[in-house]
């Protein structure tokens, strides 16, 4: 079992409230209990190992995917509901309770973020943290302090193992 709750060194400081570290099992429970979760993936998800795990998470939990950056081509031909959106626009839209969502069924209550550059996603989640009730679960390789919950800083192998544990727990 990978301990994803350690090594939470802050590389930047955006505020006084930082995310709580989480385990793959707890993250899986929160994802399963979410009413309207959205898997938000970044360009780093084009790593074949990470892409495979993102697809498995979306399929197993029946979660739509918001493909940001240049990640959309990775989901073409996969059996997932993926739509492209600019990450900064998504961060703006999810703070609006009247936003219809990517599917027209309303806004999302939980964002699961994976495959982003840490300083970029931290800025986007700063807005959602401070201006909405949306929860953000960072299952990234790096600790994301503006998420509601986050894995700690992990090696690549530990990150893959943690994602496998999360998939098994969904």
Curated annotation (Swiss-Prot):
It holds the Pfam family CO_dh. The keyword ATP-binding does not apply. The keyword Coiled coil does not apply. InterPro entries: CdhB, DHS-like_NAD/FAD-binding_dom. Keywords: Methanogenesis. SUPFAM superfamilies: DHS-like NAD/FAD-binding domain. Pathway: One-carbon metabolism; methanogenesis from acetate. Signal peptide: none annotated. It comes from the Archaea. One of its GO terms (biological process) is methanogenesis, from acetate. Heterotetramer of two alpha and two epsilon subunits. The ACDS complex is made up of alpha, epsilon, beta, gamma and delta subunits with a probable stoichiometry of (alpha(2)epsilon(2))(4)-beta(8)-(gamma(1)delta(1))(8). HAMAP family: CdhB. Belongs to the CdhB family. Part of a complex that catalyzes the reversible cleavage of acetyl-CoA, allowing growth on acetate as sole source of carbon and energy. The alpha-epsilon subcomponent functions as a carbon monoxide dehydrogenase. The precise role of the epsilon subunit is unclear; it may have a stabilizing role within the alpha(2)epsilon(2) component and/or be involved in electron transfer to FAD during a potential FAD-mediated CO oxidation. This is Acetyl-CoA decarbonylase/synthase complex subunit epsilon 2. It comes from Methanosarcina acetivorans (strain ATCC 35395 / DSM 2834 / JCM 12185 / C2A). The lineage of its organism: Archaea, Methanobacteriati, Methanobacteriota, Stenosarchaea group, Methanomicrobia.
């Amino acid at each position: 079992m990978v301990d994803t709750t350690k090594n939470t060194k802050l590389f930047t400081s955006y505020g006084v409230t930082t995310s709580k570290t989480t385990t793959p099992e707890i993250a899986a429970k929160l994802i399963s209990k979410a009413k309207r979760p959205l898997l938000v993936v970044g360009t780093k998800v084009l790593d074949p190992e990470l892409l495979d795990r993102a697809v498995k998470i979306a399929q197993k939990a029946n979660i739509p995917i918001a493909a940001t950056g240049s990640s959309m081509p990775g989901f073409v031909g996969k059996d997932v509901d993926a739509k492209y959106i600019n990450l900064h626009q998504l961060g703006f839209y999810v703070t609006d309770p009247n936003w219809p969502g990517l599917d027209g069924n309303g806004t999302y209550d939980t964002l699961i973020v994976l495959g982003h550059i840490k300083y970029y996603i931290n800025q986007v989640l700063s807005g959602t943290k401070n201006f909405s009730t949306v929860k953000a679960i960072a299952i990234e390789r790096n600790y994301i302090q503006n998420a509601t919950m986050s894995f700690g800083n992990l090696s690549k192998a530990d990150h893959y193992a943690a994602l496998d544990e999360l998939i098994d727990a969904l």
